[in-house]
Amino acid sequence: HDVLPWNKIEAFHMDEYIGLNPSSPQSFAYFIEQTLLSKRNIMSKNFIDGSVDVNTMIENYTKLLTAKPLSMVGMGIGENGHIAFNDPPVADFNDKVWMKEVELEEKCRIQQVNDGCFPSLDLVPKTALTLTIPTLMSAKSLICVVPGKLKAEAIRNTLYGDISEKCPASILRKHPNAKLFIDTDAAMYI
């Protein structure tokens, strides 16, 4: 029995590869649609389209985000500590924009191959669109689910390392209503 009023939920997603449209099987929009949203009666779905002009997408998505503040963000943490596509080299806790174009760190791209999203590194896009850290942190509630031993070091750094852009997920410790759910493998270093 569902306890969520799905018909009142307006869904957004956090990041997308530049060059992929929402119907591409490697896109996050496709994954979210197939695994969750298509199974529920959602009020509206707002996907990032990585195949359109980047500046237009940023402008349009920013308008949506500013008109409809985020209530809850469901997220994971990458092997390098990224949240959304805010990898350590491009993460900025004080970004002044809601969304930006980023170059993906190789470790992040390798994770996409290891996760089975792409058959080889040369097929993983090098750039993406991402909601910025201040945008994610603006949500009233953050739910973070992180399984697997490959994420264990990132979990340790998130919980016990310095709060810095070297581990973008470390900023979650400053959110007043962030919840972290991990499995035994992800907890192996804590």
Where do the model's predicted regions map?
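Ligand-binding beta-strand-loop-alpha-helix segment within the catalytic cores
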Residues: 4-74
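A glycine-rich beta-strand to alpha-helix segment
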Residues: 64-92
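ATP/nucleoside-binding phosphotransfer catalytic cores, i.e., glycine-rich phosphate-binding loops
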Residues: 131-134, 138-190
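Short beta-strand segments
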Residues: 13, 48, 74-77, 144-147, ...
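Short, flexible loop segments at the rims of nucleotide/cofactor-binding pockets, characterized by
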Residues: 49-53, 119-125, 158-159
